[in-house]
Amino acid sequence: MAKKITAKVKLQLPAGSANPSPPVGPALGQHGVNIMEFCKAFNAKTMEQKGTIIPALITIYADRSFTFITKTPPASVLLVKAAKIDKGSGEPNKNKVGKVTAAQIEEIAKLKMVDMTAKDLEAACRTISGTARSMGIEIV
């Protein structure tokens, strides 16, 4: 018989450096999960992507065990890296803070395809382009 799911928790954590302090501790502690066990497993799984923000979907079962799935980094994080900027614009329609090429947009879309609902690469590119525009990043 399958285990009974008691909770699903979504967290965005820096790859390879999760620790029991907030947000991990409070989010998992209230469900009785062994926090250090999660941190060690997450860090081992994401060590090669160190420094990137990685979303994790944690499924917690009635016996206090857990499983987790890591997703691809958010499009905004990938765009900030590609444009080599610190953060997006506070006024995206007035102030442009960086530039990315169409090739970079396509590369990000290929990486994000597994987590997106887009039917093809062209639709994924349009989605990523929209994210870039809303961050004040110009597409050249």
Curated annotation (Swiss-Prot):
Keywords: Methylation, Ribonucleoprotein, Ribosomal protein, RNA-binding, rRNA-binding
Record bears the keyword Magnesium: no
Domain of life: Bacteria
CDD domains linked: Ribosomal_L11
Gene Ontology BP, a term: translation
Single Gene Ontology MF annotation: structural constituent of ribosome
Keyword RNA-binding tagged: yes
Gene Ontology CC: cytosolic large ribosomal subunit
PTM notes: One or more lysine residues are methylated.
Subunit note: Part of the ribosomal stalk of the 50S ribosomal subunit. Interacts with L10 and the large rRNA to form the base of the stalk. L10 forms an elongated spine to which L12 dimers bind in a sequential fashion forming a multimeric L10(L12)X complex.
Family: Belongs to the universal ribosomal protein uL11 family.
Function: Forms part of the ribosomal stalk which helps the ribosome interact with GTP-bound translation factors.
HAMAP family: Ribosomal_uL11
Protein name, per record: Large ribosomal subunit protein uL11
Lineage, opening ranks: Bacteria, Pseudomonadati, Thermodesulfobacteriota, Desulfovibrionia, Desulfovibrionales
